[in-house]
Design a protein with these regions (language model features):
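A short glycine/small-residue-enriched secondary-structure motif
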Residues: 56-70
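An alpha-helical repeat/solenoid feature that recognizes helix-turn-helix modules
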Residues: 1-16, 32-56, 71-109, 113-171, ...
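Protein-protein interaction modules outside structured cores
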Residues: 258-259
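N-terminal capping segment at the start of a domain
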Residues: 26-28
């Protein structure tokens, strides 16, 4: 964070409240649910481990997997997007999954979103295949961002990665970038109508494409996010915007202040995923290492 981006003094109180909530809501198995008292789920568990670097990570080391793919919850199905997030967490925390991180990297490279034939109602290239949320479904923006970023990080850690999978994922994100910049959840245009971009998906898209900063889609999306970051006031949207813009070296003071103001509401609502994301975003001592290439 730039020297001019000093976060307000009440941030320390917000950080303490978020950490206390996550600590008290942790399940006996070491994971976190979306809401206290519920079963542990992969997404909030990953963000909580990223946010609290000193928390025991045994739960993720032992997280159930089938055929190299992590399950979204115990006795559940694989979720490719959260598998990518888990890989980012494993690499950042220097955890070796019981199945081997190499097996998890290989597992996510075996699956891909379903291709669709070109048609007159879509301007995007539906032949591009990246990642879906679940098997036998079409590619979506969020799982593609998590998986592509995880593979880029894995490659930089010396793990075997199919570069063509990463390049096709990048191409899909560029292809689906909205006209004015940013990303919708799936498509940029349907039956001739441009779809709106959203802050969380745009932040994730930028993080995934941070090594492609010369792309016009990235420049347009960065401009869009700077303009629209405060338009979605949820802790999840503000947190992701804060992290993405910070990674790109842009000013984040206004977003950080808005996020701090949102923390009391986040704590009242009790969403542990949002609390973990906010704690990660407001901390600066980790230098966003989990998400930076």
């Amino acid at each position: 964070m730039a020297a001019t981006d000093t976060i307000s003094l009440d941030t320390s109180e917000a950080l303490a409240g978020l950490r206390a909530r996550l600590t008290s809501a942790r399940n006996a198995d070491g994971g976190w649910a979306y809401y206290a008292g519920k079963a542990s789920r992969l997404e909030p568990t990953c963000w909580a481990l990223l946010a609290m670097g000193d928390a025991s990570s045994d739960v993720l080391r032992q997280w159930p997997a089938t055929d190299g793919l992590l399950l979204e919850r115990r006795d559940g199905a694989s979720n490719f997007g959260f598998h990518g997030l888990a890989l980012l967490t494993l690499l950042d925390r220097k955890i070796e999954h019981q199945a081997g991180n190499g097996a998890l990297v290989a597992g996510i490279q075996r699956v891909e979103g379903r291709a669709s034939p070109r048609n007159q109602f879509s301007v995007q290239n539906n032949q591009l295949q990246a990642w879906s949320w679940m098997d036998e479904t079409s590619s979506w923006v969020e799982p593609t961002t998590y998986c592509a970023l995880a593979l880029k990080k894995a490659a930089r850690a010396g793990m075997p990665v199919d570069r063509e999978r990463v390049l096709e994922a990048d191409a899909l994100l560029v292809d689906r970038c909205s006209v004015d910049g940013g990303w919708n959840y799936g498509n940029s245009n349907v039956v001739g109508k441009n779809l709106p971009s959203y802050v969380p998906t745009t932040a994730l898209g930028l993080l995934s494409l941070q090594d492609r900063s010369s792309e016009d889609a990235v420049r347009r999306s960065l401009t869009w996010l700077e303009q629209e970051a405060l338009s979605e006031r949820s802790s999840i949207a503000l947190s992701l915007a804060l992290v993405a813009l910070r990674v790109f070296g842009r000013p984040v003071q206004a977003i950080a202040s808005a996020l701090v103001q949102q923390i009391p509401t986040t704590l009242v609502l009790g969403n542990l995923h949002a609390a973990a994301l906010a704690l990660y975003a407001l901390r600066t001592d980790h230098a966003d290492a989990a998400l930076v290439l």
